[in-house]
């Protein structure tokens, strides 16, 4: 359970759910890029970033903690938890001994250690296990000195372990990434032969399953979450006294712009993961089945705690929105450059950048550009999918609006996943010069301060705003089935990306604590619509008929 994916007000209830199912330890990832969004500025206190409080509640609820601090964690999180600003260095090598990477890591670990050190087990705290990196055997660089350096850095900061690595359960994943004296985690460990192999690769250390999957990740355009029965694996672990970690026991939501990607497949905003506890914190049938199974291993006369009360949900009648503005009516001051610059060079993580230039008179040919992100092309203000540009007797305005939807979170391709236009843009053989770039990072203060404007004719990228009144607050799922693609904010809180045009997620989870009695404000940005559509609140997530079987990849 990752605190950044769960409303802070619900942390205790989620811990109680874990204990009531029969678990004695909770693992969680620390997302570096959430705590150091801007280089050198750390935040370990705001809302869902207060891991000191999270650890304290775990202790109060009688649970141990398996800490997974990275620096890389994957977890279908933007850039695997690494800060986007690392990519401002053009040739940086991530996850290795490159000093341009290790120096920021050292600074981050120093700040993180101040928070977690008092909670270490040898200081009377709940942190029972600390992970070194994550699935490094799947990374082609395999800098063993880097792994040892991470372990030694923790020791230097007063964190003495115990330590563990986590890798796939095959020899090629484990080769060259084990550390003497450091336990081995398998992602996942599913049979005795895999555990025996791990012991052979690093004799004398404990082995556990660090990621046993009751579900699997999902991308936009794929099927809805599909549960996987792991009762057979639980029997194996319990009968043979093997430690295990359910990934995920409770997934929650990847709020804001934190969802990652695998290649050109973007991760969903929902991180339900078909876990025993669903996105909203409600126990599923699998939860009760696993609870019964684990309870059967208790000594005579002992029982599990009662399952805590569920968090209530509510429906909200149709909310009327109006067209408030649009990206084109909110253009900021441009940045000028001979050639287009990527998002990171412009000091931006995600959101949009509008690139504008002029095609000289008489120039024709196919428009070609290297880009990372989803582009919409405008010629003289008219959207087009035709890349064949005809010659004109006067210069032509070309605009390319690029949306970034999460950096790659797995494998070495993440090193080159800078967003926006990369390098030169050509029409035929002519390189286009002298670019204006308008940056839209879409931060909450920008959304809450939007001025109402008249619409720009024919321009997509509408910003729609509405209000709704509540007498009581509860969790809800805001239904965006009538919209296409964009971002949703409620009371200034970014609930994440919506992409109903692709599915399978059509409703975004809105926690009750983020609502208020009286007037609430909703803002929807949609890249494809020019007219507002109503939004409703549902008491459950939507699913589709399309489901996919769970399988491990990578």
Task: State where each predicted segment sits.
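The substrate-binding groove and active-site-proximal loops of carbohydrate-active enzymes
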Residues: 1-8, 32-49, 87-107, 131-142, ...
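Aromatic-lined substrate-binding rim segments of carbohydrate-active enzymes
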Residues: 10-78, 151-156
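Aromatic- and acidic-residue-enriched segments that line the glycan-binding/catalytic groove
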Residues: 40-46, 60, 71-95, 147, ...
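Catalytic-core region of carbohydrate-active enzymes that cleave or remodel glycosidic bonds
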Residues: 63, 156-157, 187-278, 282-285, ...
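A cross-kingdom feature marking solvent-exposed beta-strand/loop segments within repeated
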Residues: 274, 278-286, 341-345, 373-395, ...
């Amino acid at each position: 359970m990752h605190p950044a994916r769960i409303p802070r007000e619900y942390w205790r209830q989620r811990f109680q759910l874990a204990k009531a199912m029969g678990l004695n330890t909770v693992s969680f990832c620390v997302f570096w890029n959430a705590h150091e969004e801007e280089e050198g500025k750390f935040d370990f206190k705001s809302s869902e970033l207060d891991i000191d409080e999270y650890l304290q509640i775990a202790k109060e609820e009688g649970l141990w903690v398996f800490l997974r601090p990275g620096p890389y964690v994957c977890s279908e999180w933007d850039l695997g938890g690494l800060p986007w600003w690392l990519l401002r260095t053009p040739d940086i090598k991530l996850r290795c001994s490159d000093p341009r990477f290790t120096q920021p890591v050292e600074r981050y670990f120093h700040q993180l250690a101040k928070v977690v050190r008092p909670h270490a087990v040898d200081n009377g705290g709940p942190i029972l296990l600390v992970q070194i990196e994550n699935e490094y055997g799947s990374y082609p660089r395999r800098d063993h000195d880097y792994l040892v350096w991470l372990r030694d850095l923790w020791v230097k900061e007063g964190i003495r372990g115990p330590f563990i690595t986590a890798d796939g359960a095959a020899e090629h994943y484990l080769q060259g990434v084990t550390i003497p004296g450091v336990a081995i985690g398998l992602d996942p460990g599913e049979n005795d032969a895999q555990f025996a192999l791990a012991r052979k690769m690093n004799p004398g250390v404990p082995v556990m399953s660090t990621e046993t999957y009751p579900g699997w990740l999902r991308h936009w355009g794929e099927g809805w979450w599909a549960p996987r029965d792991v009762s057979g694996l639980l029997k194996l672990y319990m009968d043979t006294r093997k430690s295990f970690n359910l990934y995920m026991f409770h997934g929650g939501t990847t709020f804001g712009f934190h969802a990652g990607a695998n290649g050109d497949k973007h991760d969903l905003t929902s991180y339900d993961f078909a876990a025993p506890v669903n996105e909203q914190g409600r126990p599923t049938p699998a939860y009760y089945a696993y609870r019964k199974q684990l309870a059967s291993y208790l000594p005579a006369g002992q029982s599990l705690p009662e399952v805590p009360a569920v968090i209530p949900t509510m429906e909200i009648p149709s909310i009327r929105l109006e067209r408030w503005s649009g990206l084109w009516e909110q253009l900021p001051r441009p940045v000028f450059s001979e050639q287009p610059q990527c998002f990171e060079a412009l000091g931006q993580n995600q959101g949009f950048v509008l690139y504008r230039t002029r095609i000289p008179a008489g120039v024709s040919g196919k428009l070609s550009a290297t880009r990372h992100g989803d582009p919409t092309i405008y010629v003289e203000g008219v959207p087009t999918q035709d890349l064949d540009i005809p010659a004109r007797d006067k210069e032509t305005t070309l605009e390319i609006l690029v949306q970034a939807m999460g950096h790659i979170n797995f494998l070495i391709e993440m090193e080159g996943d800078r967003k926006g236009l990369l390098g030169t843009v050509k029409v035929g053989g002519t390189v286009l010069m002298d670019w204006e770039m308008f940056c839209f990072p879409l931060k909450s203060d920008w959304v809450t301060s939007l001025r109402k404007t008249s619409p720009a004719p024919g321009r997509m990228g509408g910003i729609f705003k509405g209000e709704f009144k509540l007498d009581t607050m509860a969790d809800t799922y805001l239904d965006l089935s009538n919209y296409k693609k964009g971002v949703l904010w409620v009371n200034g809180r970014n609930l994440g990306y919506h992409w109903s045009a692709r599915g399978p997620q059509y409703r975004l989870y809105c926690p009750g604590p983020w609502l208020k009695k009286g007037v609430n404000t909703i803002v929807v940005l949609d890249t494809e619509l020019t007219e507002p559509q109503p939004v409703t609140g549902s008491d459950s997530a939507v699913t589709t008929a399309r489901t996919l079987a769970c399988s491990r990849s990578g």
